[in-house]
Structures are given as structure tokens and as C-alpha cells.
Amino acid sequence: MAAAPSATAPKHNYTLGTNASQLELYKYLKTVPPIPELRQAVTIKKYEEASVDDTLYPLIDEHQIIMVVGAFFGDEGKGKTVDAVARHPACTCVARVNSGENAGHTVFDDIGRKYVFNLAPSSLLTPNTRNYVSSECVMDPISFMEREIGQFIKSNMPYKDKLFVGNVFVVTPYHKLLDLLGSAPNSSTLKGMSPIHASKVTKRGIRLDHIFNDEGVLRARLAKDMDTYYGLLKVKGLTDKDVVRRCQEENADGVERVPGYVVDFARAENKIDYLVKLYTERVKNNKDFPRRCDVTHELRAALARGEKLLLEGPQSYWLSNAREKFWESTTSADTTAGGLLASAQFNFQRYKVLVINVHKAPGSSRVGIGANPSSFVPQDYYSAQDIKTLEALPKGGCVDFDKIQNFFYTKAFNTESKTFNGIYEPLEYEDATGKYNIGVAMSIASARHHGECGAVTKKPRVCGFFDCVLHFEVNAVQGPYLSISAVDRGDDYDRIGITIAYVYYDVGNKMVDANGRVYKNGDIIKAGDPVPCEMALYHCYPIVKVINGWKGAPIAASKRRPNEPLPKGVCEFIANVEFFTGAKVISIGNGPRGSDIIYLKQ
């Protein structure tokens, strides 16, 4: 563990090894009295495998609108559940209804070709589906054509009768440059999300229809919206050359975070002419651009015909801009289930709605900035050291995942002690490259072993424990159904930890007033208690219940026989998640393929 950053999360001089501040922190945390829930007996049910026809499909049959949404901080592995729902015979329409290309899903077709979708629904490869990008989405049409539609053109895969685009808000090059120039390191995907949503709410900028209509109106709207861009350059004292140089610096490690056409915009002398020409040639007159339609009307008509609709949720509940707890470090759209339904513009009184929450464990993760009480290291640990990709992690360090996880759960967690309070000791793990704080070692090893990097950003994700405190609220708002992906990772663990509470501690003895409650050192926040705002969560540390793993009894699809009884450790893990969150686990992931799902008898 490491000392928490302040509410504004400034950079810290983090170390690889255990430092004096971590030892001082643990000196206090080890005195926290154990909470009764650590020793509370949880009934271990016998969970049995069942077919998709007997589990998921009956749920779909009872509803008209199905939503698959993230339950943590994104990157939960939603695509697999989306694919499973989309294959239901009556599910004919799949839609993205808000947010933009800051989501990422990797899908493989029947012959193993890889496709990466950021804005297009990930069910584009699913037979007999019509896929929609709705009008409340934000789209960079140039990136959309290059990165997403270009995959279909290259592989000669038809898409014109499967994909339809509404009157989306257009993300321009200057929105992406505003994002680059105005964002703190690691705080953004650089996809222009905050700037385009600012244009949206101030009724500036353009929508897709503007590109296909009067050029004079298009030019006028672009010119008005670009005042913000020119204003930022003036305030920061930047020239076009400075902006180009900043773009080149961002791309210097070989990852193209700023596309070439955005850099060309920064170079362009007449930027309005550049944009009009760009959109005329590559959108308006582009025969490969997908068909356009009134998406809301089409989806309502499909529902009226008795067809079922799947709404594919981008990001997640806790990354929703409509949730106060992590508001400063969220995306710019309401990515909760309620937000999706509102963006889809349906009469919610008319239809039965099914929400399937998706979480991931072990190795629950987050990218970007913000609080993350259940993480192995502070959320800004990598960005503070300018680590942008997995390749930039310490060379040769923390590569023995098995040794590290064993040390973590058997040494740092002294579960045999009568005074064990669920807080691990900041011991040091040592390998040939040096000494590492065990939280740092576990974070690096998890990122390496599980390939945890952002689907969009390529940044290492910060891993940690399954957080029952946060999921209790998710379940209360949009539960109870939960699919947990990547559970086969547990095949490599001797034990598994889940967060069942937090303890608040600030080294300066500072208190935080959140919604009228004052949080002070030693305060416990349990699953089911009000979740405080991020100002308090920066100073919260996980109280972890350690449960038995199932190493030696793998559930990975490549090693397990179908319908083989689930190991006791898996059942114990699921039972504890259900007990502390109130969720109902309907499936667990056990491999990389779309079909690698174990459905649980309900």
C-alpha cells in the first residue's frame, strides 16, 4: 500500500520499494480493530453449470430491452456477454446510444480475424443483427472510417446492411487537441470526450447532418466552436508549431495517440478550409460511409414489431458523469443503465428492461486518474512515473507471478493471527532486479500476467481486489444480475481477496465532510454504507477478506471438461460476492473466446 494522494491527486515521488511513509501508514492501519464481517460465516452454495438456453435466454425472453453495462471502471470484458445476448434469436437490434470512441472491444470472427471496435457495436460480426450508432453518441467520423470501417473494407466483409449511423455529434481535430493540451497526464484517452461534450451542452459545434447540408452553415458553426481552441492557445501562449511539437511528443513511443489528420489540422494555415475539405472528401462523398438513419425511430419500430433490443453500454457505472462519487475522474456521458435508457429515448413505462452488470475478477482494474480504494497501488502510480505502456514497466522485474501472488496472500496477509484486520503488511518482495513493495510487485505482476492495459490507451491498468463496497451500490441501482468475467485467472492464485470495507485515514489527521457526514481517521465504510465522494475515497484503504483459491483445479475452458463440478474455491468466491453485495451471479468467464462462459443454474 502507499500513502494516499490528496483530493486533487498531484504527482508523487513513488518508489518501487517500501518507503518510510508506507511504514508509517501501516503503523496506524494495523491498529484498526477487526470488523466482525471478516470472520462471518458465509454459506457456500453449490453452484452448478447450466446451458445458456436454461439461464440467460429465459431472462431475455421476459424482457424487451436488454442492457449489458460495466459495473466497475470499464474494461470489464462486456463484449463476451454482449455477443451471448446478441445471439438470442429474437435479439435483432444492437445499439450504442451514448459516449464515443473512448470505449474499446476486441472481437474475433469465425475464422480468427481480429476486429477492434471503439464506437461501433461489438456485435457487428454476429449474424442476423442490425447495429446502430445513435444520435446521442459522439463520433470522430475520420477515425471511425479509418480504424473501424477500414477493418471491414480490408477484409472484404460486408457491413452496409448491418450498420446504421444517426445524427451524431462530431468530434473534430480541435476537440482532440483541446483534450491533449488541457488534460493532466493519464487523465484522458485523448479522444476529445470532454471538449465535444462541452460543445454539445453549449449548443456549439456540428452534428453529422451539418456535413451533408449547407456549407456556409457548416463553416459558420465550425468557426464559432473553434473560438474555444484559439482561446486556449492564447491563454497558454502556444503557436501552431508548439501544438505540432506536443503531438509528436505524445506519439514518440510508437503508439499513435494523436492521429495524423489531427496533426495536419494543427499545421493547416486555414483550418476551416482544411476541415470542410476533410469532411467533404472522407465523409459526405465517401461511398464507404455507413448508411444514415433516424436511429431512435428505427429502434422504436423494431420494438413495436416485437423484436428485442440490446443496448451495449460503454465504460461503466462508476465512470458515469452522472455519478457524484468519482465525478472529477469520469467520462463525460451518463454510462449507467439509467443513462443508456434515457439516451435511447424510449418510453420506459412501456417496456420491460433487463440489466446485466459485468465485473471482472481477479484483477479488477481501472485506467486513468482518480480514487481506487481497492487497488494494489495508488491510481496515479504509473502516470506519476510516465509509464504509458506495459513495455515501459521495469524490465525483468516482477515477472514471477506465481511467487508474487503466493508471497502476497500467505505473508503480507497474516490471516492466522487473531488480530488480523484485513489489511496487508507492506512487506518487500525481492527478485534479481531489486526490492519491491508487495503492492507494487502485485500490481506490476498482475498487469504483465493478465495483459492488463487499456483497450484504447494501451496504458497499464491498475489492478486490485473485487470491491464489494462499490458493487453494493451498483447492485442497489441497477442489479441484481451480475456476470463476472476472467474468473479463470483464479486458476493461478493460491488465495483470492475481496474488499468488504474501507478504513479512512489521513496522515495529516484531516477530516472530509461528504454529504453531511464527517469522515475522520479510523472510520469504517462497509458494503451497504453510503459511499463518500472522491475527496474521502482518496484516503480510504481496503479491508480484505481472504478466501481460498482453486489452484490445482482449473476452470479455464482449455483445461476443464464441460459440466464438471465447480471447485469449492470458485463457489466460495461467488457466494461471498453475492453475500456482501446482494448480487445474483448468472455467469462467469473462463477463457478468451466468446463461448468461454460458464452459466450458473438459477
Curated annotation (Swiss-Prot):
It comes from Trypanosoma brucei brucei (strain 927/4 GUTat10.1). Its EC number is 6.3.4.4. This is Adenylosuccinate synthetase. Gene3D superfamilies: Adenylosuccinate Synthetase, subunit A, domain 1, Adenylosuccinate Synthetase, subunit A, domain 2, Adenylosuccinate Synthetase, subunit A, domain 3. GO terms for cellular component: ciliary plasm; cytoplasm; glycosome. Homodimer. It is found in: Cytoplasm. Substrate binds at residues 455-461.
